Amino acid sequence: FEDYYEREAETWELQALTRARVIWASSPAFQARAEGAIAVALRRPRDPKRTAVDVLEMRQLMEDERPGKGDWDLKLTPGGLVDIEFAAQFLQLVHAAQGGPLAQNTGEALAALGRAGLGDPAALAALEGAWRLEQDLSQLLKVALEDGHDPDTEPKAFRALLARAGGVREFRS
């Protein structure tokens, strides 16, 4: 693991590693070693411009290979959860070597990056707010609708609930 992440890991693998957590370990010592190895891999210095290019290329590849299924695919649609996650992962990767915060949860990462002054405060606040909104709406849609169902076809009361969850007066897709 340590050798691979030092010599061979691509940026997308490091992006995924920002979300890694040890679920089970055979001993507390092994857990500490695993957590330490993750932190070392993430805290290596990296070129911000190269990292930005890599992240943008991976996002484009995802969009080409697995596009969103419409406006209500809150994860994959442009501006959706994946874009917010990629922004948080990018900022963590480029600032970690200088002691920037690392957090597995995207909302916590954005908040920590904001507190550390590692990005435009208004942009980070907007990303965090959008992430929370999309989390709330995603949960509501998962509970209320079958996969692939279009909220536009739902009864007026359900659309009003979506509008309220989204903090707007009325529902319009």
List where the protein language model places each region.
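A nucleotide- and high-energy phosphate-metabolite-utilizing enzyme signature
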Residues: 1-173
